[in-house]
Structure formats: structure tokens, C-alpha cells
A protein has these predicted regions:
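Solvent-exposed, conformationally flexible loop/turn segments
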Residues: 32, 178, 229-233, 266-270, ...
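Bacterial N-terminal signal peptides
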Residues: 2-13
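Beta-strand-rich binding/interaction modules
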Residues: 234-262, 289-291, 332-334, 339-362, ...
């Protein structure tokens, strides 16, 4: 007897070929001296490492507002990683999981994924939170336990971690020259969600979407900070060690090229970035940064980064009318890149259209981005109203925007009863109720309720005793409710 076996493989995600221009690359240099794994990222101990950053949200290439910095190093027996994670608002990290292989990902934590064979099937996960609790897994099998070290150090406004992962625990030899591993680093930040170095689509467990970690004894390249793009201007910094390295970076705005530069870095490099300006502010738009470092004759890049960043308008205004409550609420959102937020305030004003302001409110940026002001009905001019907000820096105006509202608290429909009727339009029929309902829970009451096309008979209970539709009974029997507690 012959047997035909059909194997159907459905990939979890579209794989990154080595040539994919959106796949991130980083190259770790020659083996060096092992750092002390204590959670303190000492610049001297990590001097020979290669940095990486450019974290984005899951299923998007949009840069995250919080950008961790990762450093990668190695010696003859280990891969080493250091991670520094800034935290919003200067807060301290939050971590509750204390049991090995517990829900570490729910805390402020970092996750490292390694696919030494780069076959998109076998991979390892190493996760740790801000108090040093670990989770390790082979693929999704968390019963696997590896021999590796992890230490964390918490601070106010940030935390850091260091990892030492033996090549032996990855069941592989030390990487050969120009070997390429599947690689990703992810960060979980309480209150902000998760971010990833390599742009996965649905979850961190997508080895086909891991980035590329290249190993070399003579070359190294990576990006350390993208502050120049995120802040609307400044510098992008990184490292490119080795001879013959050529770097190219492009900046696109809404799909059109805004800037392009080429350089031949040697060691640490700095790329000046200046976004197009709208007065004192970076011009609004969706920016795409593409950076690649390569060497002539190589088939693989040394470093590649592709990231998007949306710059919103510097000042946005919204207004909501609460007609019944008789108030108008205004809200301004400030994108104050490059400005001292402590010196900023917003002045709201109402005026008859084309006229002078009749009432103003002024408020400082208390939460860093949003300012609100409320106006009562007596303060709101009749007819068309001009609502404006002016951004102030140390009391001096630097940007004003406005919008016109038409009778926001006395709209034309207020008090109009057009369309309000107790009559039920055809083909629907009015609800008919017959019988007298007794007090709740009493026996013997009988009520018939006839909505459109059905007849519900109630006989003193919560559920109908019968339901009739088109002359036919719908219920096969009475509806009963049974409840039990502790088996009784």
C-alpha cells in the first residue's frame, strides 16, 4: 500500500532576505575583554562594543518615543549585551515578577532573540526585568533553561541591564568571520507598550522578521542615537570601525527626498540632521531615515537602519461644545521640539468672527503637551465665534492658530421638535401591552406583549411562558433557570 504524505508549511511572517532594504543590520567587531555583568553599563568596559538603536512599534516602522540603546560585544566563549532604557517622566522602573519564567514581559523588561543558524525556525529567547528576574525559552518552549547571566540596575528615569550568553548554551560554535545570525532586541515599557529593533509584524516571536547580526574581526558598525531625527534636528551618532567603509544616509519627507549625504567614517561618526523648518519649528510631515554602511566588494552591509518619524504641527487646536451643560471646552496640543517646556504657556481667546477678543484664558503646559481652557455660555459670543490659541514662550507669542465655530452653544437645531413624534411609522406597528402586571414576584399575573410580528406571554415570571411568531409557537417548552452553589 502506498502512502502519500502532504506537508503544508505556512510561514508566520514574510521573511527578511539579506537584501531587504528595511531589515536592520549591525556588525559586531573582534572579540575583546569580557565586561563585568553587574547591570552597570561602564563605558570603559564596553569601549570595544558596537551600539544599536532605532526601536519602533510592533507592526510599524514609526520610531518609538522612548529609544533604548543596546551594546553588543563578544569574547571567545560569550555574546554580551548591555541595554539602557530611558523611562518617561523621570519615573523609576516597575517590576513585579520574581519567579523564574514568570510573567516578566509584563514588567519594565528587555527581550533578546537569537537565531544562530538564521534558518527562521530554531531560535532562543532571553528576557529579564528591572529587578533581575529572568525568563528563557527555546522558541516558545519556556521549559528550556539555558546557562546565562543577567543583571539589572534600576535608577530614577532609566534602568540598565547586562547579559552574558555562552555560545555553548546556544548549541553553536563561536561565529566565524562574516557569519550572520538572526537577531532582535525588544523593550517592554510599562504604560507605553513594547518596541522592537527589528520591525516584526504581530509579535516578538517571528524569527523570519529578525534583523541581521554580522560578526567580523576587522569591522564593526552601528548607530547609537537618533536624537537628531526625533528632536527635529541635531545629530545622529554611531560607530564605524575598519577601512574602506562608505556610508550613505537619506532623509525623505512625505516620500520626497529632503536630504542625502555620503561620508567615509573612521571610528565614531556624527551625522548632522536638520529637518525643513516652519519658522522656529520642524516642518510637519512623515520623515523616513535610511542609513547604510558598507564596503566595496562586500555582498552584505555592515549596518543598515530604516525608520520613520512623524512630526506633527507645532500647535493644534480642538474645541468641543457641550450644549446641554452650556460650556465650550478648548484644548491645545503643543509639539515643542527644541523648546524649554517650562517656559511655555497657551493663551486661548474667543471673539466674534472678525472682531476683537471678548474673553481670554491663559494656562501653562502642566503635563508637557496638552493645555485646556473652559468657557461658560455667558462668555461665548452669539453667532459665529473665532476660537484661537497662541503659544507663548516666556510670555512672548511665537505661534497662533484659530478656527471659526457657528453658534457652538446655540445650534439651529436646539429646541426644534421636527421629527419628534410618538407615532410609529409603517410598516412597523406600535408596541401593544395587554393585561395587568402584578407586583414583582407575585403569581397569577398575565401580561401579553406584542411588538412587531410577535406575541410574548408572561405569567408572573422573568421569562416569557410562550412566544408566538406568524401563528406558530417558537418555544419548545417553558424557560427554566437553575443555579447552584457549592454543589447545592
Amino acid at each position: 500500500m502506498a502512502t502519500l504524505i502532504l506537508l503544508l508549511a505556512i510561514p508566520a511572517a514574510v521573511a527578511f532576505p539579506l537584501s531587504d532594504p528595511t531589515a536592520p543590520w549591525v556588525t559586531a567587531g573582534a572579540p575583546g575583554v569580557a565586561p563585568t555583568i553587574d547591570g552597570v553599563v561602564d563605558a570603559r568596559e564596553w569601549a570595544g562594543s558596537v551600539p544599536l538603536t532605532g526601536f519602533t512599534g510592533v507592526n510599524t516602522q514609526e520610531l518609538s518615543s522612548i529609544q533604548p540603546t543596546v551594546r553588543v560585544a563578544r569574547d571567545a566563549a560569550h555574546l554580551y549585551l548591555a541595554v539602557h532604557v530611558p523611562l518617561p517622566g523621570g519615573r523609576s522602573p516597575v517590576a513585579n515578577a520574581r519567579q523564574h519564567d514568570g510573567a516578566v514581559w509584563e514588567d519594565d523588561s528587555v527581550e533578546v532573540f537569537l537565531d544562530p543558524g538564521h534558518g527562521h525556525q530554531e531560535y532562543f529567547q532571553f528576557t529579564g526585568n528591572a529587578i533581575g528576574t529572568r525568563l528563557d525559552a527555546r522558541g516558545r518552549d519556556s521549559s528550556w533553561n539555558g546557562d546565562w547571566r543577567f543583571q539589572a540596575r534600576a535608577g530614577k528615569g532609566s534602568w540598565s541591564a547586562e547579559l552574558a550568553i555562552p555560545f555553548a548554551t546556544l548549541q553553536t560554535r563561536p561565529p566565524a568571520e562574516n557569519a550572520v545570525w538572526g537577531f532582535n532586541v525588544c523593550a517592554n515599557i510599562r504604560g507605553l507598550g513594547s518596541s522592537t529593533w527589528s520591525p516584526v509584524l504581530r509579535s516578538f516571536h517571528e524569527p523570519a522578521r529578525f534583523g541581521h547580526l554580522r560578526f567580523s574581526t576587522t569591522l564593526a558598525a552601528g548607530v547609537e542615537t537618533l536624537a537628531g531625527l526625533i528632536d527635529g534636528g541635531g545629530e545622529i551618532k554611531g560607530v564605524a570601525r575598519g577601512t574602506g567603509i562608505a556610508m550613505r544616509w537619506q532623509l525623505l519627507r512625505d516620500g520626497a527626498q529632503a536630504a542625502e549625504k555620503r561620508l567615509s567614517p573612521a571610528g565614531e561618526f556624527t551625522l548632522p540632521v536638520e529637518l525643513p523648518r516652519d519658522g522656529r519649528f520642524p516642518a510637519a510631515g512623515r520623515y523616513s531615515l535610511r542609513v547604510v554602511a558598507e564596503r566595496a566588494g562586500d555582498k552584505m552591509p555592515l549596518m543598515r537602519l530604516a525608520a520613520d518619524h512623524t512630526v506633527s504641527a507645532p500647535l493644534e487646536l480642538r474645541a468641543r461644545a457641550f450644549v446641554n451643560a452650556g460650556r465650550l471646552e478648548t484644548e491645545a496640543t503643543v509639539q515643542a521640539a527644541g523648546l524649554d517646556r517650562a517656559s511655555l504657556a497657551c493663551r486661548f481667546a474667543l471673539a466674534p468672527e472678525g472682531g476683537k477678543p471678548s474673553v481670554t484664558r491663559e494656562a501653562a503646559l502642566t503635563d508637557g503637551r496638552t493645555v485646556r481652557a473652559t468657557f461658560q455660555k455667558a462668555e461665548v459670543p452669539e453667532g459665529k465665534v473665532s476660537v484661537s490659541v497662541t503659544l507663548l514662550e516666556k510670555g512672548a507669542p511665537i505661534r497662533t492658530i484659530s478656527k471659526v465655530l457657528d453658534r457652538p452653544l446655540s445650534p439651529p437645531w436646539l429646541g426644534d421638535r421636527t421629527g419628534i413624534t410618538d407615532e410609529v411609522p409603517a410598516p412597523w406597528t406600535p408596541l401593544v401591552v395587554r393585561g395587568k402586571q402584578a407586583r414583582a414576584g407575585a403569581r397569577g399575573s398575565a401580561v401579553s406583549v406584542r411588538p412587531w410580528g410577535r406575541d410574548y406571554q408572561f405569567e408572573g415570571g422573568l421569562f416569557p411562558a410562550s412566544v408566538t411568531a406568524s401563528g406558530a409557537s417558537v418555544l419548545a417548552g417553558p424557560i427554566t433557570l437553575r443555579a447552584s452553589r457549592a454543589g447545592q
